[in-house]
Amino acid sequence: MSLALDLPRLETTLRLPAQDELQNLLQGLLQPTARIDSKYFYDDRGCALFTNICRLDEYYPTRTEAQIFSDHREAISAQLPDAPQWVDLGCGDCSKTQQWLNAVQPARVIGVDIAGEFLHSSMAAVARENPDIECVGVVCDFTQQLELEHVLAERPGHPPVFFY
């Protein structure tokens, strides 16, 4: 039985207490030049917008990174452990991870992102396209301590490979 046939499990290690979130927003808005931390824009709509921005001709980092990985994927993959736990930090729509799965053949994909619903949808797509790979999503805020030990401990013998 494939583990990925079920919807991916989501772990949530996210969020300051609501009062702290409010304080964070107020502190930014009361600055001489008002600002809101970008993490507050990462809901479903914000994630979809960022995905579209990454596809613009003017936004070259995504294309540049993809070309580097394409040129060196085989050599990089050869240096990685067999059947790792592929941990994609800030996975977004998981498009970068999808490009690595054939080369890396991970035992499991752990997508980490701040937007829970978008993450769940992205991990479900990975699971549908790769039914033999277990998929887990971890919802967290990178401005807080990253807590993955308990998730990684579920698959001893499969070392993590962190990907960003």
Task: Identify the role of each PLM range.
Residues S2-Y40, C47:
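N-terminal auxiliary segments of SAM/dcSAM-dependent transferases
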Residues A34-L80:
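Class I SAM-dependent methyltransferase Rossmann-like catalytic core
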Residues A83-G92:
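Conserved class I S-adenosyl-L-methionine
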Residues D93-Q105:
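Conserved SAM-binding loop of SAM-dependent methyltransferases across substrates and taxa
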Residues A115-G116:
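Conserved SAM/SAH-binding beta-strand->alpha-helix loop
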Residues L119-V126:
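Conserved SAM-binding loop
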Residues P131-Q144:
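Conserved SAM-binding strand-loop segment of SAM-dependent methyltransferases
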Residues L146-P156:
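Short amphipathic alpha-helix with an adjacent loop that forms part of the alpha/beta core around
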